[in-house]
Amino acid sequence: MMQTILSNGIAMVLIILIINIVYVSFFTIRMILTLKGQRYLAAGISTIEILVYVTGLSLVLDNLDQIQNVIAYALGYGLGVIVGMKIEEKLALGYIMVNVITKELDLDLPKQLREKGYGVTNWVAGGLEGDRTALQILTPRRYELQLYDTIKTLDSKAFIIAYEPKTIHGGFWVKAVKKRRIKE
């Protein structure tokens, strides 16, 4: 039965395409997990990843005389990158640090964000046009877009910069941010 499927040109192209999408999706997720320090989960995924990779590559190498298989392999690779990144966006692993500078001095904004469940550190900062409120907010990535919308609703002219912190240590941040539930 398998030999019949593999001898069908269209079926072979689809199998190679799907195998490479799966392989590269696993590869992308494994790399992201590795960068985020999830080494054991990354190692487990790499085991599945390599099995899929060897299967797909052997199908292509056994049929190198058929250019459509090579094209399917390359196309599957590109699509796998997109699929892997979409999966990672949905998983939203890790945390983000959001720095906000208000257009004007606004001591109420930090309070409003805290009431919504965000951990906020704030201070008065001097800008070219006068005093402003500067805020640092650490939140899980899954709340990133919600946080941006909240900030824009409370201060539509706020300056926002976000980045992923490499290391988080000390303070109430580590325990409190993990337990905190953001209110909508």
UniProtKB/Swiss-Prot annotation:
InterPro entries: DUF2179, DUF5698, UPF0316. The keyword Chloroplast does not apply. Its main location: membrane. The keyword Transmembrane helix applies. GO terms for cellular component: plasma membrane. It is found in: Cell membrane. The chain crosses the membrane at residues 9-29, 41-61, 67-87. It is a multi-pass membrane protein. Keywords: Cell membrane, Membrane, Transmembrane, Transmembrane helix. Belongs to the UPF0316 family. HAMAP family: UPF0316. NCBIfam families: PRK04164.1-5 (NF003194). This is UPF0316 protein YebE. It comes from Bacillus subtilis (strain 168). The gene is yebE.
